[in-house]
Amino acid sequence: MQDNVPASGGGPSRLFILRPVATTLLMIAILLAGIIGYRALPVSALPEVDYPTIQVITLYPGASPDVVTSAITAPLERQFGQMSGLKQMSTQSAGGASVITLQFQLELSLDVAEQDVQAAINAASNLLPNDLPYPPTYSKVNPADPPIMTLAVTSSAMSMTQVQDMVDNRIAQKISQVAGVGLVSLAGGQRPAVRVRLNAPALAAYGLTSETIRTAITAANVNSAKGSLDGPTRSVTLSANDQMKSVDDYRKLIVAWKNGAPVRLQDVATIEQAAENIYLGAWANRQQAIIINVQRQPGANVITTTDSINKMLPALKASLPNSVEVATLTDRTTSIRASVKDVQFELLLAIALVVMVIYLFLRNAVATLIPSIAVPLSLVGTFAAMYFLGFSINNLTLMALTIATGFVVDDAIVVIENIARYIEKGEKPLNAALKGAGEIGFTIISLTFSLIAVLIPLLFMGDIVGRLFREFAVTLAVSILISAVVSLTLTPMMCARMLSHQSLRKQNRFTRASERFFTRLIDTYGTWLRKVLNHPWLTLSVALGTLLLTILLYIWIPKGFFPIQDNGIIQGTVQAPQTVSFSNMADRQQRVASIIMKDPTVESVSSFIGVDGTNAALNSGRLQINLKPLSERSERIPEIISRLQQQTAQIPGIQLYLQPVQDLTIDTQISRTQYQFTLQAMSLDELSVWVPKLMTELKKLPQLEDVSSDWQDGAAVAYVNVDRDSASRLGITMSQVDSALYNAFGQRLVSTIYTQASQYRVVLEHDTTNNTGLDALNDVRLISSDGGTIPLSSIATIEERQGPLAINHIDQFPSTTISFNVASGYALGEAVDAITQAEQQMNLPADITTRFQGSTLAFQSALSSTVWLIVAAIVAMYIVLGVLYESFIHPITILSTLPTAGVGALLALMMAGKDLDVIAIIGIILLIGIVKKNAIMMIDFALAAEREQGMKPYDAIYQACLLRFRPILMTTMAALLSALPLMLSTGVGAELRQPLGVCMVGGLIMSQILTLFTTPVIYLLFDRLATRFRRVPRQEEETE
């Protein structure tokens, strides 16, 4: 065969056609590299695009929100505000806790941010209260990111304090050591402690005060260095019985001497082993439990981290007593694996559909095999590049590969169809391969680089959305590039070796019937094409109409950000009146959980109340609802949420907010709903005036539902108004007053019990069992300058006021966050417009600033760049095509096909009830790259016919349209069917994939119908314009 090789022809494919062994080995190398890369790639729901985020928590039991703000939050804010790379700082100061969330720029390393945070905490430490029981602690975690795993620890025989001790020492620490874990928090924590409840009448009878008791306990229990004795022959370490470690030790403690007799602590107080904080509670399916919430570090892989935890769980469970049970309530990887598995199935289905299309068009098993090999080679080879680029197997990269299935086969189809045409004309396979590949090589290069050019703007998208789609764009671009290489190397080589005139001429009933069908179809197309070419202005009017309709549809269509996914987990917040007590809140929380547990779609419920780093106020309770797998329920999350809210509405005095857990978390604040809008002012007084007014207006908007605010200024405050003159006359200072109140009502941590494994606190408080109202303040007694004790009521009056339940700041200024969901039947864009309009109509003062947060802010950013992104894609493609064709005119002809795809995509979205979200926008951008393929194939052949055969433009474009009709139809069908599984997907995470499929299918159908007619007409129009412009200079020369 080599002896009959033509001296020229084949273009870039010639070397590979003539060297089949080298070509085969090269393809095997690509395949093996891809397989190795696939096995090493991590799996995740989405690309890792988290902002570097650190949460700083400072606990100050008993402190009011005002005290926490001024004494803790403000000093820390000032230091954190000086850090470089800080994007936003949000703080929440509640009774007993300060929570500061620091979000850094995407480019900043989390480890660098951690060092800056530690340095800022050290710098602020001297400004913090001296009696702060715990120093500020930080975690590399986004508090708004739901836990990747939730465990419930229960026991039928042990108390919750004993269970907590085991969880602390045996489970939580081990899980914290797992790579990727950012924070292990214990909800409903019942840390063991010795609680000293003072009996006010007994104290008064002995003439003692709480300060006397606190001083005695502090002095009696110490743990400090004592030194050693170093003698001539030996050394002795000094030790003493300076620690009290048991409840009995504290009961026997002498706190004073009266009339020569000792007064022991048990004489004036009840001492018991109990929980450090009695105002915390957690339940798993209504059974009291310790809830372990595991949150990942920003950027950590969910599946890798969770797998590591699951591997150690059996050993951890084995170390616990038989009466202690550890149950996994939530495992986020379940839905992630199911979602990825569904996309993998859709990828395989797309491959099968594409191969079926190839066979239907080529009607030959051998001819079908050749382009079919291009699909796995291109897709599998892409995994190698993904590995070296640090990507993961996730929903977006698998979606890119699914869409690429239709793309990667296009080039091979074009090549094999052109080679087969020469073989059918009588050429030998080798000559046909060289001629066909050489003739089509430039077209393949044009198709490839113009399609990749469309993806380039995606790489320059800013912020988190750009990071999110970078893996999508690069994965798709790499697969297209590999497919071009395969199509120019392996495909023509296989055609030269496997195709023959006899194999292509094999006939059966199916091939004869399909041949007659395609012949009639081409004849019908040719007839209509003649009519269209003879009435160009009508066709041009249709083309112009599609452009105008595209603009109108873009304006009309509802716009969203990111599809709401059904991952089988619902987060809930139970809101009660601001004056609710702990026991009352616990009862309400349990009633809500009971109703939810009865729902047939619910598998488990975990809930907790109390103020800690996760929950900001006593009147808020948290819920995590785990639904049954999607295969075991017929309803989606929106229907379930609506039903649960209706069922719990019967409980008086509570409001239940529910939202589905999403794979993408952009927010940094724990919110009751999906979207947030913030107001910021110079003072709390201004916010107190305008927040209620704005809330009233927003609740009227039909586009919104579940409107709520974290502004809570109706908490009951017992204001102690001290007569300073009287206090001074009696020798009593304000420091004594504060200390006495703290001793009585602040769960004050007055001492620490040290053991070999951990430390436990001694908690001091008044026993208010028989006196729970404001009258309990009358039991507080103070020591006067003469050594006697006087009641607080003798120097102070008590009045009940209202005050803040929590104080929020954003970037050091007072703020409030309004949360909302988008009402059914509306899109996020409509909700944002409605809020903006309502805000403008209110004429807020100039010193009150507003802005959207989290997902809503990202939506605004993405929406503002959408038009420019599409324009950039078109410009990039024009530049590439202009360079390839060395023409200003032909790229415009090719780009004229784009409005038809836009009309089809937007109409399909509206018919399917989908918003124009970022996933749909990506689909439209891909359509820009796909639909121009039809025009490129037509124009390439028309230009070749004009140049090589001397045809007139009319005849050249007409012949090109007929010759390329079958491959155009074949490639369009392949691309359409590759998107069809995404459009029809129903599994876990289908909401994420459907908009892309709908856009692709709708756009391809519309563009296929119209561009077969509009492209040749526009080609002839621009050819006439170009001819006319060329004549003008000639006429000027003749005139001269």
Curated annotation (Swiss-Prot):
Cleaved signal peptide residues: none
Domain of life: Bacteria
Annotated organism of origin: Pectobacterium atrosepticum (strain SCRI 1043 / ATCC BAA-672)
Binding partners and assembly: Part of a tripartite efflux system composed of MdtA, MdtB and MdtC. MdtB forms a heteromultimer with MdtC.
Major location (coarse): membrane
Name of the protein in its database record: Multidrug resistance protein MdtB
Pfam families attached to this UniProt entry: ACR_tran
Subcellular location: Cell inner membrane
Keywords: Cell inner membrane, Cell membrane, Membrane, Transmembrane, Transmembrane helix, Transport
Transmembrane segments: 15-37, 343-365, 369-391, 398-420, 440-462, 474-496, 535-557, 867-889, 909-931, 968-990, 1000-1022
Family statement drawn from the similarity comment of this UniProt entry: Belongs to the resistance-nodulation-cell division (RND) (TC 2.A.6) family. MdtB subfamily.
NCBIfam families associated with the record: PRK10503.1 (NF007798), RND_permease_2 (NF033617)
Record membrane topology: Multi-pass membrane protein
Cellular compartments per GO CC: plasma membrane
Repeat is among the record's keywords: no
GO molecular function: xenobiotic transmembrane transporter activity
InterPro entries: AcrB_DN_DC_subdom, Acrflvin-R, Multidrug-R_MdtB
